Amino acid sequence: MSEHDPTLPDRPIFRTQGAPGSTLSLLLLLLFSLANTGMAATVDSLEPLPASEWSYDHAAHLLERAGFGGTPEEIARFAAMTPEAAVDLIVNYEQIADTLPPFEHSGIWDEAMLADVDLHLRFDDVMAKAAEVGEVYGEVVREEGPRKLQDITDALYYKYLSSNREWQRVAQWWAERMLTSPRPLEEKMTLFWHGHFATEELKNDDYRLMLQQNMTLRQLATSDMNSLLIAMSKDPAMLLYLDNRLNVKGHANENYAREILELFSLGIGNYTENDIKEAARAFTGWRNQGLTFIDDRAQHDEGMKTVFGQTGNWDGEDVVDLILQQEAAGEFIAGKIYRFFVREEISEQMLDELAARLRDDNYAIKPFLRALFLSQDFYSEPSLGTQIKSPVQFLVSTYRKLGLERIPGTPYFPAATNLLGQALGNPPNVKGWDGGRAWLNPSTILLRNNLIGHLLFPETAAGAYPRFAYSTRYSNAPAEARQRDRDE
């Protein structure tokens, strides 16, 4: 058992003489890849990795995939354990106290101003309501003048702006949790479910809904698919995002029914259009009032519905039960979790075995992850150093490797990940982020390179970009002096 990786230095890496580009390239290589020498685990095998083969490199791989990486000291600590002990410590994180502070609201979202507002309304709805009743958002339509709705427009813009600003603070708070949590799998799974049950703050314009959803996903991170699907079907942020407030008896809106079948549970080709229509009827009357789920029985369709060939007076919870009776659910969910934690390519044999295991355990997530993290396939050569990290994983894991205890103020985390293609709380659409190679293009590769350069060589970066200056020595020095320092 290796307690120390001989490829890692015993002291910090300092910049040496020579071409800075070469040094940076070497460090980038170290950051982007993992050593995989001496690892001969079997591909497509769910048999546990033998304790005799467990090593420092295996421990590093586990921490990287099940969390956001670790420092050499953390890796060595896990390498000194047995594989079972290491995996159990990560998976059974409830045994570790969550000592991180809750989100602290700034107060920019004025509860008093918006107390009597229908927060479901979009801009056009607000204008129509104002014209109809003469006031909205506590503001009265002006009786005369060219801009009769200006006060209402101002209130609407305040709602949008205050929610957006506060959500940026939530994203920063969440990034701090990813970096510092003693329960890294909890945050990794929260990130996974955020991409799976994609919801947009910019559409909902209410950061509180998104924060509440984030906390729900964290609470149920390794629970089971039945609990998760029901929770998200009743989640105010999700209901608002997919327009289920418009899904009422006699006028079913199919948005949520379509997405729960296509994107959240079964995948395309495993349901019919009639299944969507009938499932939509089952979800009628499910809406929210602010942060509260409402089951409006007056708007629920009590008629008989046929979903997946089974007929009954189904409601939303019944539909979730029917979904999980389909074999395709096991394949869809097992495959998505596998691709997130292991690698993009999965054999038919492995998918069938994982799906069967998930179904046999009633779609429980924790035992599924434990089996995955212990498996030889997880540590096999095709699984090592082949994952293209999302921008969030890329930044957080880099900070963890550098031993940072706080997310730096510069670059600003929400802005940096947004530039790299991943804005927490605002996936591109209900499908979430494509991931994999989609994270990389000429622009994002250059941005990743520059970001790493800025982190590793802040003084060099300050010389090139004075607005990120770390000292007056570099921000004020003439260009030739900065160049002379580089050459020394």
Go through each PLM region and give its residues.
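Bacterial N-terminal signal peptides
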Residues: 25-35
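Active-site substrate-binding loop specific to GH73 endo-beta-N-acetylglucosaminidase modules
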Residues: 149-153, 167-174, 192, 196, ...
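Membrane-entry segments of alpha-helical transmembrane domains in multi-pass membrane proteins
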Residues: 55-56, 182
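N-terminal accessory alpha/beta regions
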Residues: 72-192, 196, 201-205, 210
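N-terminal secretory signal peptides that target proteins for export/translocation
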Residues: 1-20
